[in-house]
Amino acid sequence: MSTSRPSQSSSNSGRSRHSTRIIAQTSVDANVQADFEESGNSFDYSSSVRVTSDVSGDQQPRSDKVTTAYLHHIQKGKLIQPFGCLLALDDKTFKVIAYSENAPEMLTMVSHAVPSMGDYPVLGIGTDVRTIFTAPSASALLKALGFGEVTLLNPILVHCKTSGKPFYAIVHRVTGSLIIDFEPVKPYEGPVTAAGALQSYKLAAKAITRLQSLPSGSMARLCDTMVQEVFELTGYDRVMAYKFHDDDHGEVISEVAKPGLQPYLGLHYPATDIPQAARFLFMKNKVRMIVDCRAKHLKVLQDEKLQFDLTLCGSTLRAPHSCHLQYMENMNSIASLVMAVVVNEGDEENEGPALQQQKRKRLWGLVVCHNSSPRFVPFPLRYACEFLAQVFAIHVNKELELENQIIEKNILRTQTLLCDMLMRDAPLGIVSRSPNIMDLVKSDGAALLYKKKIWRLGLTPNDFQLLDIASWLSEYHMDSTGLSTDSLYDAGYPGAIALGDEVCGMAAVRITNNDMIFWFRSHTASEIRWGGAKHEHGQKDDARKMHPRSSFKAFLEVVKTRSLPWKDYEMDAIHSLQLILRNTFKDTDATEINRKSIQTTLGDLKIEGRQELESVTSEMVRLIETATVPILAVDLDGLINGWNTKIAELTGLPVDKAIGKHLLTLVEDSSVEVVRKMLFLALQGQEEQNVQFEIKTHGSHIEVGSISLVVNACASRDLRENVVGVFFVAQDITGQKMVMDKFTRLEGDYKAIVQNPNPLIPPIFGSDEFGWCSEWNPAMAKLTGWSREEVIDKMLLGEVFGVHKSCCRLKNQEAFVNLGIVLNNAMCGQDPEKASFGFLARNGMYVECLLCVNKILDKDGAVTGFFCFLQLPSHELQQALNIQRLCEQTALKRLRALGYIKRQIQNPLSGIIFSRRLLERTELGVEQKELLRTSGLCQKQISKVLDESDIDKIIDGFIDLEMDEFTLHEVLMVSISQVMLKIKGKGIQIVNETPEEAMSETLYGDSLRLQQVLADFLLISVSYAPSGGQLTISTDVTKNQLGKSVHLVHLEFRITYAGGGIPESLLNEMFGSEEDASEEGFSLLISRKLVKLMNGDVRYMREAGKSSFIITVELAAAHKSRTT
């Protein structure tokens, strides 16, 4: 699809193109479905997809009636799956207006196990639903049916009057009626008696906790974790994560499958495989289950008097369509469970200080479960999967936001490139020098047409073809300033086929009427690889059948003449270059580029940037001084040198009197030791968080009593990173502490505290174990504007706090899910936790606070509900506390994992050492003894590394070397042995050019450290050396005599290999110039520090196609005793 881009925002143009594509794709979906219905068994899937893909959005091969009939068929289908039954009720009388064929048998069948109580109920049109179920069930059902957000109560446990059998009733509203799906409760299944997400969450608690604990920055790791957790939670044979690309085609990006199943990882499939109508339904119903694709579907019988058709789109029992069923059967998938992953539109801006408008949503992808035999998943577990998918979607959204931030950085980089290009010989410099226009956006080729001459880079059409494209653009796109397309063939360029696969997509912009810049991309299929299993020799797929392999084949056929689409941010960069060049070429025949104006512009930008930085700095100082949270600071001696307005107000001690006093004289006696320890650690660089202590009050504030603070200590450092003081960011928790103290003393009179109108009582609300609001104190009523009577006995999640029709509206779905996680953690018995929380009060004001959730226990220790305290600190403090808590948790988990690994390695290592010692007592040959010696030295090296408890000592040069005699031969041989497996794996030949006399040299020093260093640099060299090449290690030994008996040995090790060598960024990490070093870079940094402890250093040299590490150390020559 070609796009001529006028001057408009990227978001609007992108959304417009997406809407156009959806409309066109829906027509294509309708035609594929029509072909299938008409052709029956002779339906040729691959050719159908291929033909429909050639139809653009403006040209429909069939009438609109086909599309209309298709959408009606999707939305108004009257068939259900037989694993349950369905009733439709009039929403006013609760009488049956439609029912499935199997409903009478399932709901009114007599069971001999239940005593007969008279006439059996008859189920039909007009039946009162209350006559079918037991009295308690009918009462519960009617109560739910009168509920506004009825879906929040699903599932509702009911029992049939005649058989006594239990069913889950799953209710949803449609226009004019209520649809109820009834699913039998299996005998092995413990029925869920409570409604809503609170109970279902417990089923997915482990999976949610694992997702929540993942570090950000890796979409692949997130997807792999999600499919693994769903695989374990649901028990399906195969679980996959599907991602929809910008052109609506899909890809399997993660997969877990039982042994013996062929993998589908890496598979791509056309957009028609999951029609747009189905995607729309996934946006409405986040979880979809097919129990048995071979089962016979049942009809829904509707009251003939109804003036409208019922829609079953929201039904859990809705039958899949025949085309999809055949696809499933062809891939040997009899049952499936699909979860929608819905994220925010990437181009939406959410602005406004209070409650932001709801973001537009899009279907990012699906989590799909397949089973080779029929499989039924109870509704509570499906509900848990839906909740898990929402948590997953939040994390996907965060990863996408992180990617967008990277894109924004790339845009800034392109702006720098633009300026760099224009500071030189523009416009020729943008193609003749480096960086050039191919560095601006990802492309396979680029060209400049300037003054009837052509400059080409990479894969491009030839000069004649480029002039032909320019002529075609002038003729057919003369009104536009350029064109971007992922298919010149689809855009209508007559010579597209002659260009072949190398040139499919193009972005072109005009500089002047006659001058243009082009970027070209090759076809998408060249970048697509299916990671699935390949065929055995002689096996073939029937391309006519709907199957993943034929989908993949069809997809490759579709994209043969199509490139990767041009991203909006890429086109923004291209248009930026176009606008700058056009402004400098107002008269191309008589003028050159005005460099001075560009330099002036750049200079103005720098001045603005400096002024903005100074303004930000001043604003930060002002914010600290006027912050609504207490902030204080001390110098190295513990004397106050910072005391902001808020701390002065709380304590009654003005700034001028506080400055110069020792911090310990200002705190209560009971807190002196706590503060002394915190201060001592902070001055050592160890910053403590969330430390609670009491500080004295002065003057008129003495009567109030001491102030309770929770403090985060931060070390102040100078330019050389030396600690010069400590500043403390505090939170006043005096009011909360008073309440908690009272609560502790008066547990038996809980209501007297909570309902006390005293302004010191913070806002408190609570819930029982079933999720109904059971507490709402006066402070909460005042804060929200909703009285106790208006919220008690409403569903806390959904009715009281929710996204749509609720008392206190939350910001978005992400906030709703996060609140559910926090509350459910308390219901699961976890310790109290605090979380950022925000909602819209009745008066329209957005309230931001900290939520503290505490579980309520009965006398037996069982959780019977929870209550929540709200704290209302500043927004800055909320964010700071949250970030600190997450960092602390991550650091603690990593520390525990490291401790676990170190501990678990010790046992097998001890076993290896013991086995080696046993072997040493046996009769061994010379070579065998040498191997044992090498093994022993490797084991000692492992033990040495495992015993490291403080890496900072190595970095700071404060460790002691363990000196002993050794030969250079044994150190080199042990070091080389540690990389031999990798060397053989890459087919590298290693050559040791160390002279024999040097090998036999006896030295005095820390052999294990030298061995560790050499092995590390050998490993990194092997990693970046080309396969099949050669790696050489040579040693130069130089002796210097110090006195009569001491010789100083200078060793130079040179590790050389062919190729460009290791990346520059890794070298920077080795020399300590990068703050966030990778694992490789940190290891090299430690090795270099160890070398410097041995009076040496490390250099890296690139020369004549070779790269070398040069490691120098100074050791003493060992004294050789002579016998006479």
Curated annotation (Swiss-Prot):
Domain GAF: 218-400
Coiled coil: none
Metal-binding recorded as keyword: no
UniProt GO BP: detection of visible light; red, far-red light phototransduction; regulation of DNA-templated transcription
Renumbered residue ranges of the record's region Disordered: 1-24, 39-64
Alphabetized SUPFAM superfamilies for the sequence: ATPase domain of HSP90 chaperone/DNA topoisomerase II/histidine kinase, GAF domain-like, PYP-like sensor domain (PAS domain)
Keyword Nucleotide-binding attributed: no
One matching Pfam family: PAS_2
Compositionally biased spans, kind Low complexity: 1-14
Domain named PAS: residues: 616-686, 749-820
Start and end residues of each Histidine kinase domain: 900-1119
Composition skew (Polar residues), residue ranges: 39-60
Keyword terms: Chromophore, Photoreceptor protein, Receptor, Repeat, Sensory transduction, Transcription, Transcription regulation
PTM comment: Contains one covalently linked phytochromobilin chromophore.
NCBIfam families: sensory_box
Family: Belongs to the phytochrome family.
Name this polypeptide is given: Phytochrome A
